[in-house]
Every structure is written in C-alpha cells, then in structure tokens.
Amino acid sequence: MKIKTLTVSDLTNYIKKVIDNDFILNNLSVKGEISNLKFHSSGHIYFSLKDNNSKVNCVMFKSKASLLNVALEDGMEVMVKGRASIYTATGSFQLYCDEIKKEGQGELFIKFEALKEKLSKSGYFDEKYKKNIPMYAKRIGVVTSSTGAVIRDIINVTKRRNPLVDIILYPAKVQGDDAYKEIIAGIEYFNKNKNIDLIIVGRGGGSIEELWNFNEEELAKVIFNSKLPIISAVGHEVDFTISDFVSDVRAATPSQAAEIAVPLLSDINTKIYEISKSLDYEIQKKLKDCKSRLESNERILKLHSPMSKIVNSYLEVDKLKDRLYFAIDIKIKREKQKIESLNNLLSANNPIKVLNKGYAIIEDENNNIIKEISQLNEEKEISVSLSDGNIKGNFIPIK
C-alpha cells in the first residue's frame, strides 16, 4: 500500500485531530513551574510550564484569564487544568489552560529570593553605595552579545542622541552555562581601562532560566565593587534580576540605558549656551561692581590725599578771605554811612551857617560863649565872630 504524500497542513491537522480525540489529552491536570510569563494586551496569558527535564508552552485565553483568582509570576509552582493540542499555524504543541491553581514557588524563584534577601541584608542594594552616572560620558563600555539586538539598539540610540560619544563593546555570552563569567571579565576589563566613563551590562528579555546568569552572586559582587558606574539593562520592563538591584541604575530596556547614559547633543549645546550667557552676565556684573568700587576708592583717596588736603585748605582760605573782604567792605560802608550822617548833622549845626544868616557869636577873654546878658555885668574884653571874620573889643555896660 502506497502512503499518500502529505502537505504540512495535512500533517499538522492530522496530529491535531489525533490529539483532540484523545480523552486523556483533553482532560489534563499538569503540575509545573511557570516560566517566561507574558500578559498580552489582548488579555490572553502566555507562559511555559516546566520541571527539571521538560518544558511545554501554555496559553490561557482572555475568557478564562479574567476568572483567575491568583496573581501569576515567574517561578511559581502551579497545577494547570486544560487540554493539549497543536497550534497548526506553527505546528507547536501547547496546553490550553482552563484553570490554574497555585501549588508553591519554584526552585529558581526560591533561590532568587534567598540571594536577594542575603545581599540586601549585606547592604549591596543600599542607595549610599550607588555611584553617580556621569552627566557627559564620552566613552561607554558595553558588556553584551556581539550579535544580539541589544548592542544595535544601544548604538542606534547613542548615534541619534549624540554621535560624538564612543561605544566600546566587550563581546560576552549572556545566556547558557557560566555566561556570567564572561560578563564578569567584561566589567573587570573596563575597570582597568582608564578611558571608560561608565558601563552598560545588558541583554534582551527571556525566561527566568535564560536570565539566570544575571542572578549569580559572584556577578553581583563584581558589579558592587566596580569603580565605574554600571547601568543594568537586562530583559524587558517586567524582568528583574539581582544585577538590576545591585547596579547603580536599572534601565527597563537597553534602549533606555543608552538614553540614561547619553544626553541629547542639542540639550548639551543649550546647556552650554545658558552657562555661557550666565557666565557673561556674572562677569559683566563683577566688572561693573569692581569699577564702581574702584571709582569710590579713587574718590576717597583723592579726599584723603595730601594734595587734596592742601587744595581744600587753599579753597578754605579763599572762602575765609572772601568772607573777610566782604565783612570789611560791609564795615567800611557802614562807617561811611555813619560819617556821612555825622557830617550831615555837623553841617546842619555848623555855626558858620548860623553866622551867614546874620548872627554873631560872642566870647569872653576865656573863650566862653556869652549866651545871656547876665554874663556881661562888668567891663570885659570880648571877641565877636561874624560870618567873614572875628573882631575884638571891650564891653562897657550901660549905666
């Protein structure tokens, strides 16, 4: 009997039919540990269920996921009820889950929590030990795979933000047995290279098993003891590793790590302009203040200099001279006025003027003015003053 040649669709549909008609495979209860958990925007939940030897992909559709009463997380031990089938589009075997019940925590999750608690108590996560990320890094060391998307993302973001920054790659395995040793070697290499400003350690997302190298205690201690600041960019935003907690900064993605490490060149230019403007203002203000103080000191110096004192003394003498001359002039004017007034008074009472009117002044031999007739009661020699001269004679009383 000749067997018909099948198409891929024929094969996957046949296998799906066989599985779908199997009673046991349609009524499964499977126990295992959740790994690579993803919550899709559609509401569906995707994850892997594993034990020490095997792993199977699982999906829980939105209608069933909305009824869950347990918060799923990587490393959780669960019991899943559902059915097995083939997803014909990819030919992948997977479990379609109807119920999920929590059984406990997986071995790796327990190990992760134990190391996290140990390092936390030892101070490995303390903020006081975190190193500052340099504001303007010129050379950035990256420890990651040379073929993955991580290094491409970091280079692309860096070129876009500031093409003047150099990226130096230390190629290392980021998955598989002992990959953490290569990551350690990369960190130690850059710490010996004095031209590096900071280090980015990263890889893409994955299951807890795929990211486990970043949970190794030896790597955590090397990150903690690094002299250079380290940005951890492991997995996606929902993924957390021990390296994230112990590093100086945790980035949700490698692209974000580059954004943290590399400021925009336009922002740098703006900052330089603002600083230059501020410095120019401060310099001008300082010069203005210095000039003002200099002028003030010059004025003070002039006021207190010997020559200034001499000049001021001369000025003071001149003022005093002016005041003295003014006072003398006033005094002279006042005295002149007094003299003129006295002259007028004398002139008004001048005997000559009286004599001009026809009067005469009679004096005895002793020059006493004869005012009354009683002074001439006997014969005397008299002098008579007239307006144009004097005459002398003898006075003889009439009997």
Swiss-Prot record:
EC class: hydrolase
This protein's UniProt keywords: Cytoplasm, Exonuclease, Hydrolase, Nuclease
Lineage top rank: taxon: Bacteria
Example of a GO biological process term: DNA catabolic process
InterPro entries in UniProt: Exonuc_VII_L, Exonuc_VII_lsu_C, OB-fold_nuc-bd_dom
Purpose: Bidirectionally degrades single-stranded DNA into large acid-insoluble oligonucleotides, which are then degraded further into small acid-soluble oligonucleotides.
Protein name: Exodeoxyribonuclease 7 large subunit
Organism: Clostridium botulinum (strain Alaska E43 / Type E3)
Lineage: Bacteria, Bacillati, Bacillota, Clostridia, Eubacteriales
Gene that encodes it: xseA
